Structure formats: structure tokens, C-alpha cells
């Protein structure tokens, strides 16, 4: 979970592949995708063509498969992936099923809808096994596994994805479709939009439902602006709650999580009041996480540090013992300041300094020019090039008081924070649901903003075989034209009866491929 290497708007998927080489199902392959940073866990199975399309769409950072299947993997999917080989015994049905059931604390996988895809189960079990072997022992945020429904999406092969330049291009500095249409604000929205582009829906009702929300937001610009304003205040709560689960979250990140959850409240209110059923559903399903927000607010200071070891993270009033120790530490430091003033006056050494370091503790530093003024009872502790450092009985006494208090404060703050993080584990599913819903809402707001900015028109969808485009513009090419250069819009009509084929002619660079794309 190193956030320096994680791009906020991209998933970092680990994938596992299982080749079913039994006599009946030689062509069947299982696949799983797991993002430790977000908790997403997906599985499926099918032909090599289907699995190849999944790999192209999910673009995993690493793929696991059996050592014995190296040649088969290379022949089937090529050599352009970063791969890791596991022992063959990991890819057994019983072992994989037990691994998944033990992780999810279930007796069966029926509740996840994957019980009948044995190759997918084996691939999923291999991914979890690999994580357990690589010291990922805290995986409570991986709370469910979902089946990728093959018949719900339009599946594109690697050549189509490449030629359409949906979200990556082989050409340097090329602009992709995602670059043009991505108006998302949150990391969750950015990741989901990429998924939506990679996996276009086939279900007409689901597509129309998205269109209805976009239309509502376009007609109600105040709602759109208000929702976008509050989404801007929301951090990457999906990855933050994953860091809570893995125990790698900082005090500052916990406060960021609390502030993000507070920004969801006005969004929930607006969505619930909307005259659109999909938005209302989002509003109703968003959790207000009141108990979680209040606990964090009471326990941690708003300006909590990045590292708990820095101290001063826990609010006053949380622990009576902590408050008393802080009072002792502060009082001791005040005493040292008073001692400095007193000794400066007594010795006449104006440059006198009382300081401390990790090696020698507290000391009084005197420059060599004033060595003759040092009282006899001071004990030399360290000699420097231009100064001498001394200790006194009085300084020793207060050093032990201050350092003792500071050590206890550090231990107590760490204990309180650790208990808070452990207590927060019960809210993982609620925060994950909020992250998913905010991501969805962010994507829909992005579509509305894009439609408004680019003057896009809502398409009419039906079950006929007609394609009827009026004044169509290619979204990417249009944005790449020089300023004040209009895009020449084109009409396209195709159906099964009258016009099944059209012939496009013209010189080079006249826009033939733009029509095809």
C-alpha cells in the first residue's frame, strides 16, 4: 500500500490464472482480480479469448499462475505481463475453496454467486494464498468476492481497445478517450469511470437509468454544483479504510477520513431530496457513519501528525493519565526555561544554553570564551571545538522527570490510537459502500459536466437494429483541433433492411477512420 507508487485514479490489480486441463474442459480458464488497496475482489471463468479481453481491460500489475503452465500462459496470452509462478498444489479445488471460506468466515460460497465456477474459485484462492505468503495478514477490508458477469458487458479484444485508444495509446503524448471525458473529482470516481469505459453496459435499462440521472443533473445545475463542491472535499476513503484494515493508517489520515465522511452528509441530503429515483437510492444507501465520525472527532486532534510517534495526536480529555503526564512534561520544560534565566543571571554568561540530544540527554552549553565563569559544582559532560557542555544535579533531576513523562506519553498515545484503529474495523463495510456510491455519483456528475461543456446530446436507445447518428462528432479529435477550427459533423445511418453497408471514401487525413471509430 505504498501510495507513492499507486496512482489515485487507477486500480492496482493482482491477477491469478488457472488453466483447467482436465479432459472435459481443456479450454476453460479461471481468472481473479484483487486490488489490496481498495478491497475489490472479482472472479470469472471462460474461454481464452474472454480471459484475454478481461486481462486487457483490467490491466493487472502482476499475474500469478502455476509453474507448470509457463509455456501454456505464454502461448495463450503472450509475454507482455509481469508474472509470478506458484506451486501447482495451490491450484486445487479443495484448497482454494477452504482458503476462501476461511477468509470470508463462511461455510459455502453460494452467497457470493460463484459456487458453480470452479476454475474461477481456484484462481481466487490462489490470489488470497499469495497475499498470505507475502505477509499480507490483515485483509478484513476484502469482505466479499463478486462474479464478473460475461453477458452484461460489451467485451472488446486487445486490438479494438488499442485502435479506439480508450485509455492508453502506443503513440507518445496521444490523447485518449478517457483523457477527454474524465471530469471526475474523486479518486473513486476516476477508477470507476475507467472501469465503465473498459466494460460498456449491454443492459438498456441500466444505461437509460444513468442517462436519467445525467439529464436530471443538467436540468438542476444547483444540485450538480453543490454535489461536485462536496465531492471535492472527499479524499480517497476507499483506500483510507483499506489502510485502517491493514493497520498502516496514520493519525492524519484518520482525521481525513472523518472529514470526508462529514462531506458526504450534504450530498446524502441533496440526493434524498432529488426527483430522480436513482439519486434517491444513492442518498438512502449512503451511511452517515455518525458514531465513527464522533469517535474520531473526540479522540484525535484536527491537526494530528502524520506519524503517531511525533506525539500530540490525542485530544485532551480522552485520557486522564495522558493529561497529567502532559502537564508534568510542560511544567518541567517551563522549569528549565526558568533555570536558564536564573543561571544566566548568576553566572553572567549571556550566551548560556540548555538543550538536549538523544545521546547525552539534557546539558548546559557554555562557549569557550566564558569557561572561566563556570561554577565549580557544574560537571563537565562533553567537550566540543568551541564549547563545553555541563550537567548539574538539579538538571539531572528534572531530566528524569521530563524524559520519563515523555516516554509514557508516547506509549500512551500509541496505545490509544491503536485501540481506535482496531475499533474502526467494524465500519469497513459502511465506508466501502460510501466509497462505491460516491464514485458512482462522481461519474454521473462528470458526464453531466462533460455534456454541458461539450454540448453533447442524450441518445435515444431502443431494441431495434438501427444506428442513426445526426451531426456526430468524434470526442477526442474534436478536442485536438486548433482553436476556432470547427469539427465537421457527420451523419451515419445503418439498419438491417435498407442500408446494411456504407462505403466511406476520401483522401488521406479526411476523417474516414474517425467515422469508423
Residues covered by each model-derived region:
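Cytosolic, long alpha-helical scaffolding segments
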Residues: 267, 292, 299, 362-378
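Extended, charged coiled-coil "arm/hinge" scaffolds of SMC/Rad50-like chromosome-maintenance ATPases
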Residues: 384, 388-422
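ATPase nucleotide-binding head domains, primarily ABC-like/P-loop NTPase cores
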Residues: 117, 185-186, 190-196, 367-396, ...
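Charged catalytic and DNA/RNA-contacting regions of genome-maintenance
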Residues: 1-216, 225, 229-232, 236-245, ...
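A structural-propensity feature for long, helix-poor, extended segments
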Residues: 214, 218-221, 399
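Charged, surface-exposed helical/loop "interaction arms" that form contiguous linear patches used
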Residues: 246, 250, 260-263, 281, ...
